[in-house]
Structures are given as C-alpha cells and as structure tokens.
Amino acid sequence: MSSTSQVALLPKLSLPDGVTVWDGTALEYERRCNNIDEHAVHLMQTINILGIRSKEAQCLNTVLTSVARLRENRQARVYLLCQDGYGVGILKMGVKKLFVTHPSYSSLVEIDPLCVLDFFVDTSFQRKGFGKTLFDAMLLNEGLNPGEVAIDRPSVKFLAFLRKYYGLVEYTPQSNNFVVFHRYFDKWQPQRGKGHRGGNAVPTRSIVRPQNCLRVYPEYQSTTGPNDNFEEDATHRTPPPPLPPPLVPQGSVNSPGPGKKTAYELQYEEYLREQAYRRRQGGDPRLQPVPNPVSSSEIAAASCGARRRMSPTRSGVQYNIISGTPEH
C-alpha cells in the first residue's frame, strides 16, 4: 500500500510536527474543553488507528494502545509523533511492578520500572529516523537513560534498534517476557527486599513549548524532537505521591493518636474528679491521703507484667525484672 493511501486513513490533526504526550485525563480534557473543529475526535481516532496498525504489524492478539485503555489505566501515557499534520508513530509507557532475576546473584527481586508497552512507527515512515526521534523524546521527558527502561515482549527488530542506537545488549531472560537490561541494575538499590526505579522514582522534568491549540497543563506535557531548537518556556514537575500517615503501634502509651488521651492524662483527670467529689462532701482534701500522679511510662511498666520481664530494655523506666513493678 502506498504512503498516500495509508495516510489518507488518518484524520488531519491541528498539531505541529514533533512529539506530544497524552494520557486518559488529557484526552478527556481535550474532548470536553478543546474540541474545536473536532480536534479531540481526530486525535483519539489517530491513537486508535495507530494502535490497530501496531497490533497487525506485530501479529498480536489484542490491541495494546487505544483511548479506552488509556482511560482505564490513568498511569499509562502515549507519546504521539506527528509529521505534516498526521500521526506517524506511537510509544506507550507505563509503570509495572515486576519480579525479575537479578544478574549478579540470580535471585528474584521486585522492581517497578517505567516500561515500553507498545512502540510503533507507521510502515511508510520507517527507516527515516522517526523511531529514534520518538524514543529520544520519551527519554528526555521522563528524565531517564535508555538502560533504565524495561520493555514488554520486544521484537527482534526492536532489540536491534536498541542495540544500534543505545548499545543495549546484555539482559537476562525473564519468565514474564519483560526485558530488563543489566544496565538497569547499575543504579538499583534494594530496599527491604524491594526494588525501585533506577534513577528517578517519578517522571521529573520535561521541556515544554506551547504549541498552537495544544494547551499545556499539569496532567500532561508535550515535547519536541531532539533536533528542534527552541527556548525553554516552562518546566513542569510531576508531584511525588503523598507520603502515608505515620503508623502508631497499637497499645502505644506515648503516641495515643489524634483525639485520644495518654494514661497519665486519664489518671490526672481521675485525680481531679476525686478532689472535687471530696470538696462536695465537705471534707478537707488536704487531710485525705491522695496518691501522687505517676508518669505514663511507669503505669505501662507496672501493667505489662510478664511481657516486660521478657524484654526489660524496651521500657525507659527502671523496674524489678522479677516482679515487674516500678522501682522508686
């Protein structure tokens, strides 16, 4: 099929030449707020058509890249390469949690790298440098080196591409069919039995240029090819995920949690109530024997009993290891 007939199946886009990044949130925004002259409709048609062509070219059983899949997986994103107003290539990326064999000590480790899930350049535009332009734009936007990216079931042609342009050769075959090159583990450090993305934990820095009708906002970024010369107008940083709330051990005395009182506070309130009751009875509280308030740590040490005898150093209070009572 000729180049003209293939391109005719794709709608005309109001995007400049270069690479733009799209995820489910960005596409939904375009559909609702920026659908001038059916721009969003043509954009989604282009992604779906290139996803189908990628499936047919790789002889896959299912389509890997589509607007519906991007809406289902909000972490996935597609880099779209345009030339003369038409989409000519797609590169789908997403973070995956993988168990892979470490090349040094041959044991399974857990990693969560950014993965190439689909990579396709239209057959009419192959062997013209578009594939490298698309891949380089992704590396620039994600702030990664080529070896820090994992690939899902790469073809022989894709492996030859990585070897030719990036020198990626050595990798250990994995049971999940993901290719993780040995270079990935140069910066990888295990953390309590788990791995982390080599280099950066989240996509960090992208060079953004406002492009015609393309609106740039925090949900997505746009980049251009590596050979374009342009000024850096803005820098977007993807916010890291929020930190989990601090864990408070159950039964903790010193960290009761929000809205709860310590044992010392409860005892002191009981002491005040007892004083008020004696005043109402007409007695002089100064003549009544009232126990002095003790610290919460002493209360905990006295109430733990046998458990405290097993680990005397866990408490900061000196107590008898036999009886478990505080020493005064």
From Swiss-Prot:
GO terms for biological process: regulation of microtubule cytoskeleton organization. This is Alpha-tubulin N-acetyltransferase 2. It holds the Pfam family Acetyltransf_16. PROSITE patterns: GNAT_ATAT. Residues 238-248 have a biased composition (Pro residues). One of its GO terms (molecular function) is sequence-specific DNA binding. Residues 5-185 form the N-acetyltransferase domain. Residues 219-261, 282-328 are annotated as: Disordered. Acetyl-CoA binds at residues 119-132, 155-164. Keywords: Acyltransferase, Transferase. One of its GO terms (cellular component) is microtubule. Belongs to the acetyltransferase ATAT1 family. Its EC number is 2.3.1.108. It catalyses: L-lysyl-[alpha-tubulin] + acetyl-CoA = N(6)-acetyl-L-lysyl-[alpha-tubulin] + CoA + H(+). Specifically acetylates 'Lys-40' in alpha-tubulin on the lumenal side of microtubules. Promotes microtubule destabilization and accelerates microtubule dynamics; this activity may be independent of acetylation activity. Acetylates alpha-tubulin with a slow enzymatic rate, due to a catalytic site that is not optimized for acetyl transfer. Enters the microtubule through each end and diffuses quickly throughout the lumen of microtubules. PANTHER family: ALPHA-TUBULIN N-ACETYLTRANSFERASE 1 (PTHR12327:SF0). It is an enzyme of class 2 (transferase). Residues 312-328 have a biased composition (Polar residues). The record marks 58 as: Crucial for catalytic activity.
